[in-house]
Amino acid sequence: MSYIPYVVEQTSRGERTYDIYSRLLKDRIIFLGTEVNDVVANSIIAQLLFLESDDPEKDINFYINSPGGSVTAGMAIYDTMAYIKPEITTVCIGQAASMGAVLLAAGNHGKRYSLPNARILIHQPMGGFQGQASDIAIQAQEILRMKEALNEILASHTGKPLKQVQQDTDRDYFMSPLEAKEYGLIDHVILNREDLDSIEE
């Protein structure tokens, strides 16, 4: 089990202890720091919905350091990001790979950032199938459908032609932040908080 830091705040009623993620949530910050699976996705979705209900007009800041993971879980986060009213700022720290890259690109245009030493990876979904031949054929068809859906999402958010995205995701495609900016996955490479503040102003 991973260690979760706690922070203690002094209030008029005494001390109050938060786990670090709850404290960040108070400042409308969501942090994805693991692979994407159903449990993680449900937690992210709950936070997005809570922040919308708290203030539908105020931006949400979504920090991403993820190797990717489940496509269906990632799509659930992606659809929720599109569904809710607040605009979402995405920031890549470390890496945004596979579904992580899709979520990074899904931030509102003009509000997608990366720190300078991060890396971004796009590729096609992976599948390892077992079972009867007919079942494997069905699963393979579903992987192809998901692959096409992901390519269409990336094309939509980057402005790249679908055919180019299809070619680029056929194999692992690693990008530096500057390359990701040129590709259209992000809008800005930032060095520090001052860079972010100056862009937002």
UniProtKB/Swiss-Prot annotation:
It is found in: Cytoplasm. It is an enzyme of class 3 (hydrolase). GO terms for molecular function: ATP-dependent peptidase activity; ATPase binding; serine-type endopeptidase activity. The keyword Ribonucleoprotein does not apply. GO terms for biological process: protein quality control for misfolded or incompletely synthesized proteins. Keywords: Cytoplasm, Hydrolase, Protease, Serine protease. PROSITE patterns: CLP_PROTEASE_HIS (PS00382), CLP_PROTEASE_SER (PS00381). Belongs to the peptidase S14 family. Fourteen ClpP subunits assemble into 2 heptameric rings which stack back to back to give a disk-like structure with a central cavity, resembling the structure of eukaryotic proteasomes. This is ATP-dependent Clp protease proteolytic subunit. It comes from Desulfatibacillum aliphaticivorans.
